[in-house]
């Protein structure tokens, strides 16, 4: 159940949404007979590797960033991994590496550029994005307006929560 006006558990604030940023996971498969289209990440390799680098289940929900990415304010300390298309991520205005564990702190600003190559990047989060599962998946299906964050792409002002989990360094 979502707590109203309790922002203490929020991890990210979307300051600028980018062209198409959605919550995705492995997706809903094998439900077509019920009229449910296939959903989920499009680059399974980048998505799975991001979650593996965080030492978590392969199916933890992430943000899928299409074309140009969002600007996100960090509201609570956590770890992330950015994979997929080379979106030239910046943390507080400084270029930051992809495909590696990044510790982000409260007040940090994360931004993404237009990809140098490819079109989809993934921001995997320690614990995964906390949204409800529908038919076994947290993926957004825009066509049906279900899953993910209220069944839609992220918008400016959206507050995103992650699933609570000890930091990667504490688990080592």
Language-model segments: residues:
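Conserved "landmark" site that anchors the functional core of diverse proteins
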Residues: 1-169
